[in-house]
Amino acid sequence: MGFRLWLSYMKKIFCSFIFWISIFLTAITASFHLYYEPNASVDTVDALLLLLHLDAFRKIIPLFAAFPFAAQFAKEWKSRMFDSIIYRSNVKSYATAQTVACVVSSFLVCFLGLLLFLGYARLQKPLYTGSFYPVAPYGIWLENGLPWMYLLIVSSIFSLSCTLWSMCGLALSAFFPNIY
């Protein structure tokens, strides 16, 4: 029952309009500094690192990562549908399905949004010019001529941190329910 429950949550989230809008909002937010400050970064790797070091953008993106699951959870909470789900399955299956759905959806929103941003940045700038010394431990990918691997790893790590914040939001909303 747990896998089917999780699968139904994932179908609901992936078919929702807010999931796809959140991905595009993440990409647009990440691309702001390329539009307003086109000379601030020299290549795509530098553009991603600049994004990850700007506090305002780094704080907004986890909100977009939490939107799809939060909307689904709020809809379920308001309609009290979780009572019948828990009655048909059990609390452990329900909590596991909610947790995994939150993790997967928030990771995908952030990661796919960053991939869209990287694609846009790649259209604007070269991939990697070797203009700065790579930072350990992942800079080895840049030294070995694999900048895409470096970009994927750094994007994955940032997406995991956004997932952590989404999970904190889920935990807080489960302990302190708000009807608004």
Walk through the language-model features, giving the residues of each.
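Helix-loop-helix units of permease transmembrane domains in multi-pass membrane transporters
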Residues: 72-105
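Secretory targeting signals
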Residues: 28-71, 96-174
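Pore- or pathway-lining transmembrane helices of multi-pass membrane proteins that form conduits
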Residues: 21-22, 176-180
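Short hydrophobic/aromatic segments of transmembrane alpha-helices and their interfaces
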Residues: 1-4, 76, 162-164
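Helix-to-coil boundary motifs at intracellular loop junctions of multi-pass secondary transporters
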Residues: 76, 174-175
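Aromatic- and glycine-rich beta-strand/loop motifs that create alpha-glucan
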Residues: 1-22
